[in-house]
Regions:
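Conserved donor-binding/catalytic core segment of Leloir-type glycosyltransferases
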Residues: 132, 169-186, 192-198, 203-206
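Conserved acidic donor-binding segment of nucleotide-sugar-dependent glycosyltransferases
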Residues: 290-302, 310-316
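Nucleotide-activated donor-binding/catalytic signature segment of Leloir-type glycosyltransferases, i.e.
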Residues: 216-238
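Carbohydrate-associated surface elements
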Residues: 137, 159
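Membrane-proximal helix-turn-helix segments that form the acceptor-binding/catalytic region
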Residues: 112-131
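Short hydrophobic beta-strand element within catalytic cores of glycosyltransferases
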Residues: 275-278
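Short alpha-helical donor nucleotide-sugar binding micro-motif in glycosyltransferases
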Residues: 237-238, 245-250
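Aromatic "clamp/platform" in nucleotide-sugar-dependent glycosyltransferases that forms part
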Residues: 258
């Protein structure tokens, strides 16, 4: 069905470069492309990648931008930007606000830092008129933990399109792929330590290195200190073609993250018939199911190492895993973007 072009106008704020190949950016870039193609009235504005920790100048810039927007516009904030606005909540008083939450940020951290972001979210979420989330578990979390009326929350799952398949280059090494911003929540330090003493393995990490520069430095240090440059390849930002070639050339996809908003990269792996090793979470189980997946449920020393050694070097086991991957149905990019437009229009 054709989407009615709305008389409402929207301004969408997101942080950093939208062309990066990690879940949240792919999701938002899809909305941007769809809205341009269909002349849907959303203006996209790129803010600094400093969010969710903006400096004074960043806030001044945002205030300047919003002061030039008519008050009948509806503002859409990416969660990373939103949770950096605890000292500028007056922005929320002048406009109707929609928040796109991939997951609340307090889940990315432990201890005091987690508590800090949790309190921030409690304060900010109260001011929001409507929420869009990417999975049922995030909707449940917002309802239960933040006491948000579930009528104010829409689920719009991401579009997952089949990647182009390239000819696989033969290799004596088992190649493992993991995609996602280089941030603490992804637990790349644990992943590297678990694979560093396994022979004949190569780990490919794809993702934005600018989000948590301290953590990126930590990862680079682990790699150089242990002479792992040829074993752990840090790709940073790459093109779609290179990403598709990596999916075609790797043997397994791995995720060590304790929390995912949806798990787009894992869904891509499932569609690419790539066996998956993943930390067990409710969301991931819903996104990719259990066929062709090896789950683990703790980040203890040697848990992952043993799982890899016992499963990834046995051709018979590999073939069974690959054969078991079911054809899961995901939304296409257009279906996802259309649902997003419908949700903001009805918000």
């Amino acid at each position: 069905k054709k989407l009615k072009n709305s008389s409402k106008k929207f301004t969408f704020f997101y942080p950093g470069n939208i062309n990066q190949k990690t879940g949240g950016y792919i999701y938002e870039n899809n909305i941007l492309k769809f809205s341009k193609k269909n002349k849907f009235p959303i203006k996209f504005i790129e803010l600094t990648s400093n969010y969710p920790n903006p400096n004074i100048q960043d806030i001044k810039n945002l205030n300047k931008l919003t002061s030039n927007i008519k008050s009948d516009n509806i503002l859409i904030f990416d969660g990373l930007v939103l949770e950096g606005l605890d000292k500028s909540t007056d922005i929320f008083d002048n406009f109707k606000i929609i928040a796109l939450i991939h997951h609340p940020l307090y889940l990315e951290f432990k201890g005091k830092k987690s508590e800090f972001f949790f309190k921030r979210a409690v304060k900010i979420y109260k001011k929001i008129n409507y929420f869009i989330v990417t999975s049922l578990s995030t909707k449940k979390l917002l309802s239960k933990t933040f006491h948000i009326n579930s009528n104010k929350i829409s689920i719009v799952e991401p579009g997952i399109e089949k990647f182009k398949i390239y000819k696989k280059t033969l290799s004596t090494k088992v190649k493992i792929l993991s995609c996602g911003s280089i941030i603490e929540r992804k637990k790349y330090d644990y992943l590297i330590k678990e694979v560093q003493n396994i022979e004949n393995i190569q780990l490919h990490l794809v993702g934005d290195v600018s989000r948590e520069s301290k953590y990126t430095s930590k990862i680079k240090k682990i790699i150089s200190k242990n002479n792992l440059k040829s074993k752990v390849i840090l790709h940073g930002k790459i093109s779609q073609v290179k990403l598709e070639k990596l999916y075609s050339n790797c043997d397994f996809y791995i995720s060590t993250s304790e929390y995912e908003g949806f798990g787009m990269a894992l869904a891509n792996a499932a569609l690419s018939k790539l066996p998956i090793i993943s930390y067990k979470t409710e969301t991931i189980q819903k996104t990719i199911g259990k066929d062709g997946v090896l789950y683990f449920d703790n980040h203890n020393k040697d848990t992952l190492k043993n799982l890899i050694i016992n499963n990834c070097f046995d051709n018979k086991k590999y073939k069974i895993l690959k054969k078991n991957i079911k054809n899961k149905k995901y939304l296409t990019n257009d279906q996802s973007a259309k649902l997003f437009m419908k949700a903001i229009h009805n918000a």
